[in-house]
A protein has these predicted regions:
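Beta-strand-turn-beta hairpins that frame and shape the catalytic cleft
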Residues: 1-4, 82-91, 120, 124, ...
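Active-site neighborhood of phospho(di)ester-bond hydrolases with catalytic His/Asp-centered motifs
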Residues: 5-7, 26-31, 54-60, 76-78, ...
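Conserved beta-sheet core of the metallophosphoesterase superfamily
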Residues: 46, 55, 138-198
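Active-site environment of divalent metal-dependent phosphoester hydrolases
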Residues: 10-15, 33-39, 58-67, 97-99, ...
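Active-site charged/polar residues at nucleotide-handling catalytic sites that mediate phosphoryl
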Residues: 21, 120, 156
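Conserved catalytic scaffold of divalent metal-dependent phosphoesterases
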Residues: 11-12, 34, 62-148, 207
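Short, charged, surface-exposed secondary-structure boundary motifs
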Residues: 35-39, 84-89, 154, 189-196
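Core catalytic region of metal-dependent phosphoesterases/phosphodiesterases
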Residues: 6-84
């Protein structure tokens, strides 16, 4: 299975049209629009769905009601788990409060509650907010990740965990046996590819 991993699209849906290759699904880790409306976020999701079916969580710049938007090709996994071929994908959207005018804020307790609802444990986790201490450095210095997300990954060990939010901390890391991915902001042309073959996962960072 070949997955396209994206985050922090911020209205740059046309960038996705330039991504080469075919994918079985798109895993999208939030922040689809700066325009502060459900219609704007849906417009971006529909553009991504022209590549492959989209499994997503909203980000802090997206309206909270996006978490329940769904159609045949666009599937929210905020607080729930859905099948994806032989795998399962689930997650949580929003972010811990920032100094900016967020639309979708969640406290640590809410993130923990959402993650504990994920049954069964998904092999593919998608959470806008990164785990504390992993791909979460603002300006390369200050960690702003979630302790609840880190705890969940450490305890449940999904095969892969996809995050966004911190544009400048794009990369790959490991948390126990979990591959942690920040594909980077699609707004700047960054994305990642994941190849899944049974329990083997290979992730490559790309740029359009």
């Amino acid at each position: 299975m070949r997955l396209l991993l994206v985050a922090d699209v911020h209205d740059a849906a046309k960038t996705a049209e330039r991504i080469p290759g075919n994918f079985d699904a798109v895993i999208a880790a939030g922040d689809f629009t700066y325009r502060r409306s459900l219609e704007a976020a849906v417009e971006v999701l529909e553009a991504l769905a022209r590549i492959a079916p989209v499994y997503f969580v909203p980000g802090n710049t997206d309206p909270p009601e996006l978490a329940s938007y769904e159609n045949a090709a666009v599937k929210p996994v905020h607080g729930r788990v859905l099948p994806l071929g032989p795998y399962a994908v689930g997650g949580a959207g929003g972010s811990l409060p920032t100094p900016f005018n967020d639309l979708f804020r969640v406290a640590e307790e809410e993130l923990e509650r959402l993650l504990q609802r994920l049954t069964p444990t998904p092999q593919i986790l998608v959470v806008h907010n990164p785990p504390r201490g992993v791909l979460d450095k603002v300006g390369g210095v200050r960690p702003v990740g979630s302790a609840a997300v880190r705890k969940y990954i450490e305890e449940r060990q999904p095969a892969m965990s996809v995050h966004g939010h911190i544009h400048e901390d794009r990369g790959l890391d490991m948390l126990g046996g979990t591959i942690v991915v920040n594909p980077g902001p699609l707004k700047e042309g960054f994305y990642a590819e994941a190849l899944l073959d049974g329990t083997k996962i290979t992730v490559r960072l790309r740029r359009v």
